[in-house]
Amino acid sequence: MPEHRFDLSGKTAIVTGASRGLGSYFARALAGAGADLVITSRRLQALAETRRAVEALGRRALPLELEVCDHASIERIVEAAQEHYGHIDILINNAGVNIRKSAVEVTWDDWNTVLDTNLRGAFFVAQAVAKRMIPRGYGRVVNIGSVTSVFGYAGITPYCASRGGVKQLTMSLADEWGAHGITVNCLAPGWFETDQNRVLYQNEAWVAYLEDRIPLGRHGQPHDLDGAVVFLASDSSAYITGQTILVDGGITTGATKATVQDDA
């Protein structure tokens, strides 16, 4: 396949939740492929490092403050992106939160915080961007999900519910927007160390336990997602839509290295 199929030169991408963690790496990966960026966070000053990284790659970065639970805020940043660059080609719908509590301790406010950010926010950001993509007949929407859309995990029930919702949202939007030249896919990372789960990675026994259940034998590193996010944002994925792409080292196969060894 020609290398230019992965080239994002001339494209503009919005990345939400881009101040740190995987969102910052998504912005860098797209910039490395040639895209100009709109990067968003709840705190504008938190975007400084990501902006520097994008500009160091020779691309432009427009930092904007976004509260995904506020519809007016969503409309403001999408309109600002449209006015600044003239078009929006790619959305990486990444903003998300997690609250760790047992299911019987989750409060009404906890539930609303997670679902409003991870699911309602994802929908209305995608909606606002699609309104600009539809007249052009082109767009790439990449919703960031999780393996928790496939597996349930104790202690993060609202998060699992929200990620399952994102998976279904992806399929529904793909069905509706395909006629307008817009693909909608979900990139679902496995276990990557982030600000949301860093406390778990301080437990060496837990890390070893989980690694034994990952066929590739290790946790994910941010660069492991570069190829997938660029692929889904590029014309190489033009005939792929409504799909959830798991980048998880194989943990969702349901097998373990120990099981294979025992059965051999």
Predicted regions and their residues:
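Alpha-helical segment proximal to the catalytic Tyr-Lys
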Residues: 131, 175-179, 238
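The beta1-alpha1 cofactor-binding region of Rossmann-like NAD(H)/NADP(H)-dependent oxidoreductases
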Residues: 44, 66-77, 108, 224
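Short C-terminal tail/terminal secondary-structure segment
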Residues: 2-5, 151, 230, 241-264
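Substrate-binding pocket helix/loop in short-chain dehydrogenase/reductase
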Residues: 102-103, 110-115, 210
